[in-house]
Amino acid sequence: MIAIGLEGSANKLGVGIMLHPEDGSTPQVLANIRHTYVSPPGEGFLPKDTARHHRAWVVKLVKRALREARVSVDDVDCICFTKGPGMGAPLQSVAVAARTLSLLWGKELVGVNHCVGHIEMGRLITGSTNPVVLYVSGGNTQVIAYSSQRYRIFGETLDIAVGNCLDRFARTLHISNDPAPGYNIEQLAKKGKQLVDLPYTVKGMDCSFSGILAAIDGLAASYGLNGKEKEEEEKLVALSDPATSEAVENVKPTRADLCFSLQETIFSMLVEITERAMAHVGSKEVLIVGGVGCNERLQEMMGIMARDRGGSVHATDERFCIDNGIMIAQAGMLAYKTGFRTPLTESTCTQRFRTDGVFVKWRD
């Protein structure tokens, strides 16, 4: 059985084609195509611009995916699309494309929860069985565990998502959005040496990122770190090296120091709430999914915690961590095989589609 998946909940448009062999063997990725709308440095992406991008590229990506997978329309069994959560305008653009293909090709629709798509793709790629899931992206921050055919949310952000915090700070520093602001912050953080004190807000298994963002934005403004004086910053980086200075703490922090401090603080918060969830459900596995899950420092910190508990951490690379169509095809096919269908009249989008709102019929 073959499913085509369309993802477009934010600025990334993805089309994926997944094969589930009839003999029940491991599913195969036949195509995984993605195109990203990139906004100028210092700016975020607006829903209307992202939707326009998706409308302009979706047909091209579908044709390219079919060619790469070497399948015809007749081979496709179902069309899966992101029903939510996400930004309204881009979600609607992809939903319209999915409905159009359904009518043109005579194939049934399967609406997929974006978060469940991340989880199921992560489970497939890593081989993890029943992990505590840390779902971290630009729009979501949740600690999840499976129970009684639901992906239960044990903890989440109380305000903005961790990825949104990183993206907005990248705008403050006028860091490039290509290939992604969070990735560029990660690379800059590797050069940081001075840890700046920032707010740390954890409440049980929930956390908050708006306060730390406001604090670090204020620090960046007070130090004049707007990304325009790179020569001076390079000198400060040299001064902050212990090999050249004995009073590191007295040196004005650089952009790299602020990125380093932000990552260390927010990732410590994520590790804490994940460990608490592991203790609660008795799991020794952690699966990190979502765009922020690509961050190597987050994976490293989570790995230290998991190993201390006698457990392990699982994560995927950027092909599957970042929003993609293949995860929608995977989750959609799992639902399709249980008899689930989305009638055309119910193929609307839901911006606040909760992870625990999905009945996971395909798991025991």
UniProtKB/Swiss-Prot annotation:
Entry cofactors: a divalent metal cation
GO molecular function terms noted in the UniProt entry: chromatin DNA binding; metal ion binding; N(6)-L-threonylcarbamoyladenine synthase activity; nucleotidase activity
Cofactor note: Binds 1 divalent metal cation per subunit.
Catalyses which reaction(s): L-threonylcarbamoyladenylate + adenosine(37) in tRNA = N(6)-L-threonylcarbamoyladenosine(37) in tRNA + AMP + H(+)
EC number of the protein: 2.3.1.234
GO cellular component entries: chromatin; cytoplasm; EKC/KEOPS complex; nucleus
Residues annotated for a divalent metal cation binding in this entry: H114, H118, Y135, D323
Chain sites annotated for binding substrate: Y135, V136, S137, G138, G139, D167, G182, E186, N295
Top-level taxon in the UniProt lineage: Eukaryota
Gene Ontology BP term (one): positive regulation of transcription by RNA polymerase II
Key words, A-Z: Activator, Acyltransferase, Cytoplasm, Metal-binding, Nucleus, Transcription, Transcription regulation, Transferase, tRNA processing
Subcellular location: Cytoplasm; Nucleus
Pfam families reported in the protein's UniProt record: TsaD
Function comment: Component of the EKC/KEOPS complex that is required for the formation of a threonylcarbamoyl group on adenosine at position 37 (t(6)A37) in tRNAs that read codons beginning with adenine. The complex is probably involved in the transfer of the threonylcarbamoyl moiety of threonylcarbamoyl-AMP (TC-AMP) to the N6 group of A37. Kae1 likely plays a direct catalytic role in this reaction, but requires other protein(s) of the complex to fulfill this activity. The EKC/KEOPS complex also promotes both telomere uncapping and telomere elongation.
Family: Belongs to the KAE1 / TsaD family.
PANTHER family the record matches: TRNA N6-ADENOSINE THREONYLCARBAMOYLTRANSFERASE (PTHR11735:SF14)
Subunit structure and binding partners: Component of the EKC/KEOPS complex composed of at least bud32, cgi121, gon7, kae1 and pcc1; the whole complex dimerizes.
Protein name: tRNA N6-adenosine threonylcarbamoyltransferase
Species of provenance: Aspergillus clavatus (strain ATCC 1007 / CBS 513.65 / DSM 816 / NCTC 3887 / NRRL 1 / QM 1276 / 107)
Lineage summary: Eukaryota, Fungi, Dikarya, Ascomycota, Pezizomycotina
Gene: kae1
